Amino acid sequence: MEHKKTTTLLECFNKALSDKGIRKHLYNEVYEPHFEKIRHEEFNFLEIGILRGASVDAHLDYFPNAKIYAIDTFERKPPTQIRTCNEPDPRFKWLKADSTDPYLTAKMQEAWGDIKFDIILDDGAHWFDPMRLTFEQCSPMMSEKGKYFIEDMWPLCWMTEENCAKIWQLSKFPDKFSRAKFDEMIKSFEHMKTTHYDCRVKPEGHRIGTSDKDRNGGKPYLELAEWIGDSTIMMLENK
């Protein structure tokens, strides 16, 4: 499949109808300063959790020389219903697997060989245990200068108990989103250099550098305050 060159990462996300762009998170604001430096290089990119394949399409578009690898359980959307999985592309490979599987590293090596990834992007299960377990399985396959991104992490480090009580996901699943499990996850990153990016709606209803018109078609930001409350990214690098 030939991918038409698009100017910016935001345009790629928007064209692919990915929620990483203007449809929801605007994660391009975090990614592009890192991605543009290697945009035209040959490297390996691993994405964990692809759902309908929109972000895979965007990354194939944005990185013309990269090879994109994907892992998903495909429980919500089988690969037969994902266009990218059914159209041959020499730059895209996928594997049906659970990213928390203790044998995942071996399965990836069996499928793809002794490969190293310069970018690993975890967009899988968005609670703390699977984020930690996925990191433990996939980080050994990160290159020395690679970057590991974890999306949609509820930032309990920035939230009070009162904040958490107002978020239905955190109230409904207290075990999945406990502070103890958050702390356990953070502890597993201690040997890494970490940067935590906050892409959430601000309390006053605005995000820095993004206008209402660009973000939400002119609708008030406060309408979005809860459902993008997990819009943070943690970037991990080798020290």
Report residues per predicted region.
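A short alpha-helical cap/connector motif
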Residues: 1-121, 125-150, 154-239
